Amino acid sequence: MKQTITEKIFSDHVGKEVSAGEIIESKIDMIIGNDITTPISIKQFERSGATKLANPDGFAIVMDHYIPTKDILSANQAKISREFAYKHDLKNYFDEKDMGIEHALLPEKGLVIPGDVIIGADSHTCTHGALGAFSTGMGSTDLAYAMITGKNWFKVPESIKVVFKGKLDKHVYGKDLILEIIRQIGVDGALYKALEFSGEVIEGLSMDDRFSMCNMAIEAGAKSGIIAVDEITKEFLKDKNLRDKPKFFYSDEGAKYDKILEIDVTNLDPVIAYPFLPSNGKSVRQAVRDDLAIDQAFIGSCTNGRLSDLRIAAQILKGKKVARKTRLIITPATQKIARAAEKEGLIDIFIEAGAVVSNPTCGACLGGYMGILGANERCISTTNRNFVGRMGDRTSEIYLANSAVVAASAIAGKIADPRDL
């Protein structure tokens, strides 16, 4: 039987050939929890009477949404995960001593391996498909079941193959590719499907761009996003202390897909997702014509807080100043990224431009802290969601964009095209 990469990964884990639509129980290689969702999993774990994790080394807790904690409630919530991690002597517990947003930190630590089946109690767990793994978000109770048994059940998803061809223009990145897909198919256009990204454009993308694309697969309703391993993937993995041996799977010629989409990116401009859906994409040229003044610009998150994003922003901000009526917040996705940015002089460029640089955290993206929007404020952001009230007051607006557009907009005080600078 001809199989997709997703069908092959599940077949390997189940020990028999499976196909899309089948209900299976699969071994889980890595379970990911965070400070918001893990306490619920812990409660269910303890309620079940379980005393031991099925696979302690395959469980990671990352304190990232409120780190350091912002108030008494978040401090008490963090305490639950912290005490559980100490009680079970978790090797993969990450807090203030080694901070990072989970979906940037785990690949950095070598905890995501090609061929894995990964679940996390966070919808953007699909990020890790960029490394040729099946990775998806699940509920906290599903996480608890996997903590106890080391397994979970799935319906093997059908796949949508997206083939990108052409050549990217300057300041068009992976973020623009995924926003364009979502614009074309809508927020439910890939419901419970595996979005498989391929083509000559993908072959030339950096890992950072690939992570951005897979991260936002969920915004099209997808169960997962996935990119087959190639030389760029292998180069990324080369210096990682991988917890296990990787397995490389590739879709067969003639494998069955729900649909195949072909997208020519040759004339694609940077894409801006207008409020209040990631599918509300428009060209940056349209946004410039709309003359949209901004109160806040944000660069960070598990979508676009990586080193390449900071480098792109620094190139644009160097020698410039953030507009008087605009504030720019920059949040590196991990401590390693923050340190690298500091060594390269990027942090100095940001501060001299008038930006504030925070520690790694999810904070602003979910409207938690470190960048909450007030009434009627408008923000251009490298994050992944622009729903009503996502980053603050229900009357505020979020426009999603790549890091170059956000940096250029911070200087202009309104949404701007970095190619015009």
What does each model-identified segment do?
Residues 1-421:
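Fe-S-dependent hydro-lyases/dehydratases of central metabolism
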